[in-house]
Amino acid sequence: MTLANFIIAGTEKAGTTSVFTYLSTHPSVCGSTVKETDFFRNGYSGDHSNDALQYVKYFANHCGQKTIVMEASPGYLGSGMEVAPRIHALIPQTKLLFILRNPVDRMYSSFNFHVGKLNIRKDMPFSEY
C-alpha cells in the first residue's frame, strides 16, 4: 500500500507549493494527486484500516515504485497538537519538512494574496489588515 513517507508542512505563503513542485520533478519523487490533502486535519477518523484506504487514494494510481511519496499541507503546522499523533499513528516512519518564513513578510504576502478574495477591499492598506 502506497502512503506518504514525506510530508511538507509549514505555514501559508511560506513556499510549500514551490518546494512541492520542485521536488515533484525528481524521478524518485511522487507527489500526491492534490498538493494539500489536509487528510490529517479533515479526513482522519481514527479507524486505522479505513484511514489507510482513504489516504492511499492520493497516491495509489500514479506513484508506482517511486522511493519518496509526498504531500504538502501547510495547515498541519497550525493544527500540530491534533495532527502529529494522527500522522504518527498511520505513517510513523514518515519524515516531515516544516517551512517557515519571516512573519512580517508572510503576512504581507498573505495580504496581497487575499485582497479581493476574502472580502478584503482592494483599496485597504496593509496597516489595516
Model-derived features: positions:
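PAPS-dependent sulfotransferase catalytic core
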Residues: 1-78, 86-99, 103-129
